[in-house]
Amino acid sequence: AFGRERMRAFDVRAASEKTPIGQLSGGNMQKVILARETSRPLKFLLAAQPVRGLDIHATAFLQNQLLQARADGLAILLISEDLEELLLMSDYLYVICRGSIVGEMSKEEAEIEKIGLLMTGERA
């Protein structure tokens, strides 16, 4: 029952809750992972490339779920190369290049051009 409820809440499209995750589409796999990870009390979630390769509808759904979890008090470390996603989803950004933090800024201070330069090792 709990699995069916989570599948419904996260709009997972599968023949049944017993369908192996490997038989699901990429978007449905990501939904299952997020449904599983947020099904118990968490203080922190690491989300690495959570919407990479997903269609626009699955992307919007997962981003909304993450934003709701953040609004509910969950701290999320989002790792992404998609600058628009980072600006949409983040309160604060750290830019890493070659394994080192090369920049940090609030969402309000962030500019796509500046972040892009920092990501490639250039000074912004």
PLM region descriptions:
Residues 1-124:
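Glycine-rich phosphate-binding loops of nucleotide-dependent enzymes
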